[in-house]
Amino acid sequence: MKRIGVLTSGGDSPGMNAAVRAVVRKAIYHDVEVYGIYNGYSGLISGKIEKLELGSVGDIIHRGGTKLYTARCPEFKTVEGREKGIENLKKLGIEGLVVIGGDGSYMGAKKLTEHGFPCVGVPGTIDNDIPGTDFTIGFDTALNTVIDAIDKIRDTATSHERTYVIEVMGRHAGDIALWAGLAGGAESILIPEADYDMQEIIGRLKRGHDRGKKHSIIIVAEGVGSGVEFGKRIEEETNLETRVSVLGHIQRGGSPSASDRVLASRLGAYAVELLLKGKGGRCVGIQNNKLVDHDIIEILESKHTVEPNMYQLSKELSI
């Protein structure tokens, strides 16, 4: 394999640039040319593809977002769209592709593999919801962004003796809410993977208030429901002054943490190794601090789960 491509797809995550950098440098180290596909699968179809050199990835390891940009691409879900993308790759002599993104990006890589084009997936999403890896690129940075927000909100919650509901990202996965809630000392954590009892939460808030507790923090993953609605209900049923903060897309931005930079570098380089060994249709990950790879179809058919012991711990510590 003498030429490979790399693209970022789906929602951006801090550390994607570090992964792109690792792909380019690892490939060039092995005398393999690298082409960057801009705007994800959309750029693959439109032919927005450029050769990347060492200088192309200079000064990006510490930058959030993605140098290659990203976009949603409904057209790629069609056979015609995928065939057009493969045609553009073959015109340039590109023989393999590294795809950095979440499960939607993995689905695109799977489809390309089924068309006979070798792809390797690299998990890049703040949600940490990709099976087969302990952590995804961007999760640690997003987690630290949320924890920083919790700490600051707690300062004002304490000053005004208020209850705060903080809504975080996580439409289908509660990792951000769970980890940030544990690290931030939240009184209640609501995640999509676990049922909750609203009356139990309200009772806990009332008991805390009765014993002199001046403020409370409740973390709600967006997949559970609207933080605004939770805030209204809590205030109505407890008579405690309640405010809501929806963190939104700030969770996706920012300079990647040291952990995410290292993870992205390891996974990006490993993806190139797999392609050069002729191993397409795979996706990479980290488990117990060791690099692993899995069949991409198996991963797409698997379901990510949160650590049940961590969720139980969060309940035990929030009494």
UniProtKB/Swiss-Prot annotation:
Binding site for Mg(2+): D103
CDD domains hit by this protein: Bacterial_PFK
Gene3D superfamilies reported for this sequence: 3.40.50.450, Phosphofructokinase domain
Residues in the signal sequence: none
Binding site for ATP: G11, R72, C73, G102, D103, G104, S105
GO cellular component, one term: 6-phosphofructokinase complex
Single Gene Ontology BP annotation: fructose 1,6-bisphosphate metabolic process
Keywords noted in UniProt: Allosteric enzyme, ATP-binding, Cytoplasm, Glycolysis, Kinase, Magnesium, Metal-binding, Nucleotide-binding, Transferase
Protein name, UniProt field: ATP-dependent 6-phosphofructokinase
Protein source organism: Bacillus velezensis (strain DSM 23117 / BGSC 10A6 / LMG 26770 / FZB42) (Bacillus amyloliquefaciens subsp. plantarum)
